[in-house]
Design a protein with these regions (language model features):
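Active-site neighborhoods and metal-handling regions in enzymes and metal-associated proteins
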Residues: 1-257
Length: 257
């Protein structure tokens, strides 16, 4: 495993990329309404990144992915491809965006409610949000990756939900996906020991039903096998000498956390 430790200069570039990614999710919030298509949301995000931020959308053509954002609606767990289907009141959607600025990546995702959400969908999204933060709050030098996963898994399962195991967080920097893999389940005191200067994502996917998932024939879209709702939140995190710094904070964090 090759884990990159970012220099002070590289950390500042990661901060900038992270802020830009968070700004995209703040910008798109007002457009997530009944009747809009995920294709339209994708176009708005793409144009904002390219024309306003003067940055690069990392997802577009990454390993063949055809769009700028991932839009995962209701029982879609992750990597949903924007299309021309209109969102309807009561839908829940995760929007996942990664921005490249000056060679460095900022990666974040957030849950949005289309109109007024059903109570059970709101509870799932909020539980996932709190689970992500439980994981992030363990991050400091000397913490092990298993501690992050254990904090997330314990909280999720206490709330009678399940953690998806096939997809995980990842190191990030000049390279979009680098070491280490950050699992959202695990045993405390196990796994790689965190060191100051590491940057990685924490991005739990939480299902209302069972944890099992299925990949659709498009090769990207992942759904819950039992068609239960799924939620995800994601931040890019820097390990500091004192603890951690979240590089992708946005308006939703200030509102919910």
């Amino acid at each position: 495993m090759h884990v990159t430790i970012k220099t002070t200069e590289e950390q500042e570039k990661m901060r900038i990329a992270g802020r830009l990614a968070a700004d995209v999710l703040d910008m798109i919030t007002e457009y997530v309404v009944p009747g809009v298509t995920t294709e339209e949301l994708d176009r708005l995000c793409h144009d904002y990144i390219v024309d306003v931020q003067k940055s690069v959308p990392a997802n577009l053509n990454y390993r063949g992915f055809p769009k700028t954002i991932c839009t995962s609606v209701n029982h879609v767990v992750c990597h949903g491809i924007p299309n021309d289907k209109r969102l309807k009141a009561g839908d829940v959607i995760n929007i996942d965006v990664t921005v490249i600025r000056d060679g460095f990546h900022g990666d974040t995702s957030r849950m949005y409610f289309v109109g007024k959400p059903p109570a059970h969908a709101q509870r799932l999204a909020e539980t996932c949000f709190q689970a992500m933060w439980r994981g992030i709050e363990t991050v400091r030098p000397g913490t092990r990756l298993g501690d992050i996963g254990h904090a997330i898994q314990t909280f999720v399962e206490q709330n009678n939900y399940s953690v998806v195991r096939e997809y995980c967080g990842h190191g990030i920097g000049r390279i979009y996906h680098e070491d280490p893999q950050v699992l959202h389940y695990g045993e405390p005191g196990t796994g790689f020991e965190l060191k100051s200067g590491m940057t990685f994502t924490v991005e739990p996917m939480v299902n209302a039903g069972k944890r099992h998932v299925r990949l659709l024939p498009d090769g990207w879209t992942v759904i819950t096998k039992d068609h239960s709702l799924s939620a995800q939140w994601e931040h890019t995190v820097l390990v500091t000498e004192q603890g951690h710094e979240v590089l992708t904070l946005g308006s939703a964090d200030r509102r919910m956390h």
